[in-house]
Amino acid sequence: MTLTRTRRATLSVAGLLLAGSLALTACGNTDATPAADAATPAAVTSIDGQMVSLPASGKPTAVFFFSVGCGECVEGVRSLGEAATAAEKSGAGASFLAVDMDPGESKETIEGFMEYVDAEHVPAAIDEGAALSQRFDVAALSTLIVIDGDGKVTFRATEPDAKTITAELVKAGA
């Protein structure tokens, strides 16, 4: 009986040590490539062939991350479109970009979605290799970020309305 208790105790301690060492190993960052500096300009090609720079030549940019299959993203892209229309009418110096996080969605599918939500006037791009979502630390669909003219993210939210997007662009220098 004593041998069994000793054996159990030894195995329990060994198991805890193994679990602890595995947990600590998982906490380490093994990615040897540093994240890109958000202030360094990035260029993406929209689905209609436009080159879009982030940040956009000294002016703030609202960037919304979505997927056509995301039901919650409908209102967010619609709000982005409304904010873009308001900025154009007021002459505010701001840029807009809708970024599809699903590389499997076709250009035609994205175009149809943008038309459906009345945001076809907003440039849209596919986040190839998750380059933009990684660069700006976006992990969830339906996320909007505002980037000022220097490349700094000044605002981050999930599905803000058009008024909030416009107000945050003004704060960022529009």
Language-model region placement:
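Bacterial N-terminal signal peptides that target proteins for export
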Residues: 2-14
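Short acidic-hydrophobic, aromatic-tinged amphipathic segments that line or gate anion-handling sites
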Residues: 44-46, 123-128
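Short active-site neighborhood of thiol/selenol oxidoreductases, capturing the structured segment around
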Residues: 53-74
